[in-house]
Amino acid sequence: MAAVFDKPSLFKRATPLFSGFDGPLAFAVFLLASAGLLIMYSSGFDHGSRFVDHGRNMLIAGFILFVVAQIPPQRLMALAVPIYVVGVGLLIAVAIFGITKKGARRWLNVGIVIQPSEILKIAMPLMLAWWFQKREGQLRPLDFMVAGALLVVPVGLIMKQPDLGTSLLVLAAGLAVIFFAGLSWKLIAPPVVLGVIGMFLIVWFEPALCADGVRWPVLHDYQQQRICTLLDPSRDPLGKGFHIIQGMIAIGSGGMFGKGFMAGTQTHLEFIPERTTDFIFAAFSEEFGLAGNLLLIAGFIFLILRGMVIAMEAATLFSRLLAGAVTMIFFTYAFVNMGMVSGILPVVGVPLPFISYGGTAMVTLGLAVGMLMSIAKAKRLVQS
């Protein structure tokens, strides 16, 4: 009988599962998720289930975060190759017999409908971090070329669907790993300089490049039109330019302190398109103004800085590269979303992390934060 009463309480048994968790990271995620719930309640006023579903998605993502945080980084490393191979295989399957919606072939029916490109947001940094860990201490230019090939294949398959937003996120995650692995600035500078020059040329020659009948190589027609609309939204104010114009109106009308919670006229009169998903930042800006935006941006900056600290303090090269790449995913998500809503980047369909509605994206974010927690936890357990 004594053995029965000597059993530790449920709290004591659960405590080790939370030991080593990174408090500042959890706090940043909690604040951003709370802001997401707040603005979802307002922007989804005519879809009562949207707020409930968003909360459910957060709970699912939180559970996934907790589970992944219990997996040691060395086990994550062992999963890198299988996850990458499965992800690329599913992308090939999508290209052959995927489901087409609105002109894009991005989904696959495997009993349930899935979007395999989401897997690559996690699989790509895992795979490249594994590759450079295996080559640690003997890196050669050829190793960076192999890493580039591992990156280009899935990015090319995703762009072919077409899905520019997801391909940008996967590309950013992969390039972050390659950069943190020690790629020479001599190789980084030329494409960056050429990219900047290219952007200036596009802006300078916009009237000629965006004239009727002109087609750009590489990009799909709708992608070209998005760039041209960004440069001059007034060319189609009720069509392709409507999103950008209404987003900028909402942001500007918020002023310094906003119109108040549930008082956004652009939002509640339904002028803002996709106000619970891609353009939720416009709804947030209208109701909470510049002050609210600065607080939200500060939350993302804190999250990103904390992720970089975890990366720098990680015990192994694999953990450092993975944490750095995951942190870059957060940065790319936030920068691209806020940029496109503000009219400084083309509309590419990238959600705002922890704020926008979307189950798949929320699960991906849960996986990403879980991996950061795993790396931070491993470091703390080693220190203790």
Question: At which residue positions do the language-model features occur?
Answer:
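A juxtamembrane structural motif centered on a specific transmembrane helix
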Residues: 1-12, 333-384
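N-terminal membrane topogenic signal
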Residues: 12-29
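Hydrophobic alpha-helical transmembrane segments of multi-pass inner membrane proteins, especially
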Residues: 26-243, 282-342, 367-371
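Re-entrant/interfacial helical elements at transmembrane boundaries that shape
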Residues: 169-170, 246, 263-268, 299, ...
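Long extracytoplasmic/lumenal interhelical loops at the membrane interface
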Residues: 248-291, 311, 318
